[in-house]
Amino acid sequence: EERTTEAQTHEDGSLVKRQNAVSVSDDVKIKTYSGTSLIEIGNRIMEPYGNAYKNMKNYADALNRLKAEMPNTKAYCLMAPTAIEFYAPSKYNTGVSKSQYEGMCYIYEQLKDITPVNAYAEMAAHTDEYLYFRSDHHWTTLGAYYAYRTFAKVAGFTPVDKNTLQTGKLSPSLGLFYTDTKSTALSND
């Protein structure tokens, strides 16, 4: 299946549209561990995603209430797309809208006096890089860097060049999903 993943942004970082495609595998295993469904595709395990608009509205309302308590503070909101948005067939996302992109846009539209930081386009542009741990739901430091770079642009400062940063690797790095599944496909994350 081809998934549309890359997005264009306006100068302020707001999303214009999704437009690029990434090939994803249909070789999928779905299992439940500790009451949570997990989707295994190749050497990656991910949680399914579903837009629950009531929950998204509650989240945006909570941010708006917090901002109202701090009227003189500049506030930002960065919603993080998860690996399943880019690396799984869309049929494994659930809800009214199966798109995290649409869910993020919905939340951003609800915000009052809070600047959205839409890192989606930046993440989508780098899906061929190691942005997400294969055995956990978190970003790698590289994925976090790209989100930071988007934040810097929106906040009006120059980000540190990633080539000036020291990198390293903790081995072995086995995340939450490996703990749940003991999948040998994840043993080298």
Predicted regions and their residues:
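Extracellular glycan-modifying ectodomains
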Residues: 1-189
